[in-house]
Design a protein with these regions (language model features):
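A structural micro-motif at secondary-structure boundaries
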Residues: 1-27, 92-110
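Positively charged, aromatic-enriched patches within helix-turn-helix-type DNA-binding elements
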Residues: 12-87
Length: 110
């Protein structure tokens, strides 16, 4: 079963053991969804947190970034199973998630 792991120390995430290719804002968006698991986060609230320099009523940024996160999670964009739309107002995340507060183990040098 695929589970999502968020590594707070390195600001990275992996899904099913595969490191996700996320920029800082993608990570922040994913972190907000995971730390509010099961709760609907409005597009405006996500705009305010992740894109504070933009008008929070212009939610296209959030929509584009959510689509990129879904692609990284190998989601079917027409029928997502992990990051769910809640009407037209927001998103919530479901499934198995782990938050790690220490860095992922690095391979030791020789």
């Amino acid at each position: 079963k695929n589970s999502l792991t968020i590594d707070v120390a390195s600001q990275s995430a992996s899904f099913g053991g595969r490191l996700l290719n996320l920029g800082p804002r993608h990570y922040e968006l994913l972190y907000l969804l995971v730390t509010n698991k099961g709760e609907v986060l409005s597009k405006q609230a996500l705009m305010k947190k992740v894109f504070p320099e933009n008008d929070e009523s212009d939610t296209r940024f959030v929509e584009v970034y959510i689509d990129k996160l879904r692609e990284e999670l190998n989601e079917n964009l027409d029928n997502p199973k992990i990051i769910l739309n809640e009407g037209t107002t927001g998103y919530k995340i479901v499934g198995s998630h782990t938050i790690v507060r220490r860095a992922l183990k690095e391979t030791e040098g020789l």
